[in-house]
């Protein structure tokens, strides 16, 4: 399934085509063959996919390619901390999609607050740069699997 999701995302992003799973099998299989310099024909079929399924497949593909990631960081419960973390992400060219910040979990005002950030990256290298920037800023990031 994962290989079909990546093949689907490739077809949408690179060729602006919506192809259903039966048509994606050859595209996914070609990733495992040495076809460089050879003329290959892959028959693509079907576009019979509902919008909800398509959205889910695209999101799964973006997660697999490290284009969407979720990071948990611990911050102090004081004014300016949220801005500081957002600034670190912005300087690293990350784009915040969703933020989960709940300071009412603990009754101890001196306790750290967990901040869960879902963000966009350009791929694995960029994801690693963002995580490193958060580490360098003392945020102790932990990458967690995004939920859809």
Regions found by a protein language model. Give the residues of each.
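Histidine- and/or cysteine-centered catalytic micro-motif in compact active-site loops
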Residues: 1-2, 45-47, 76
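Active-site-adjacent helical/loop segments in soluble small-molecule enzymes
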Residues: 1-38
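Short alpha-helical
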Residues: 3-6, 25, 49, 80, ...
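Short, surface-exposed loop/turn motifs that are enriched in glycine and acidic residues
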Residues: 15-19, 44, 74-75
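Catalytic phosphate/nucleotide-handling subdomain of diverse soluble enzymes
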Residues: 31-59
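A conserved regulatory-domain signal marking ACT and ACT-like small-molecule sensing domains
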Residues: 51-148
